Each structure stands twice: as C-alpha cells, then as structure tokens.
Amino acid sequence: MSQRNRISTDQVETWIFDLDNTLYPVTTRLLAHIDEHMGGFVAKYLGINREEAHQVQKSYFKKYGLTLRGLMIHDGLDPAQYFEEMTPMDLNEVDPNPLLGADIARLKGRKIIYTNASARHAELVLKR
C-alpha cells in the first residue's frame, strides 16, 4: 500500500468488531457449546427430545437466521426467558487475552461490538 493511501488509526472515528469467533478464536469451540446448550433449551421449552429439538433448531436457524426468531414466531417464546437461560454458560474455554484487550483499549474513537447473544453474554466474554 502506498504511503498516500494509508489511514492513521487516529483518523478512525468508530471501530466495529464482531464478538463471536472474531475477538476470541474459533478453537475455543464456544459457539459449538452454545449450539449444544441451545439444543437443550429448545428440547425443554418445546417438550421434545434432543434429536427433534436439533431439527427444529436448525430449521429455524436456516429460515430466520436465528433459532430465537423462529421460537418467537412459532412458539411464543419471550426473548427474555431465552437470554436468561442461555447466558449462564461456562466461559472457561475462552482464554483471557490481555494483549488484545490492551490493543483495543488503545484505539481512539468509539468501539462497537456486535453479537447475536445478549449484552450480558458479551460482557462476560469481554471480561475474560
């Protein structure tokens, strides 16, 4: 990249990050853990076995982009209930990364983090 095309990080007003499998490595398997936990939630909420729950979960995800959305539309799920049950997960697989945290903290400007999970989940992951 030529010198004239370079942008100083001081010129960036807003930084946007995706939390899931981006600010922590995919090798943590956190999304796989969430997927399994969600299957248990779907089974319990709908009163079906895990295999049926897995099919419902994947069907809703494919159709709506989020299993939660399908559960809200078809099964009357209150999202607050979903997030309450889905948030208390074991985050020990997410290794602390103080260097990344320090690098992000040094960036000037506003920082936005996106996730499909709850704000509480994001806070817990970011504290790691």
Name each model feature, range by range.
Residues 126:
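ABC transporter ATPase nucleotide-binding domain signature
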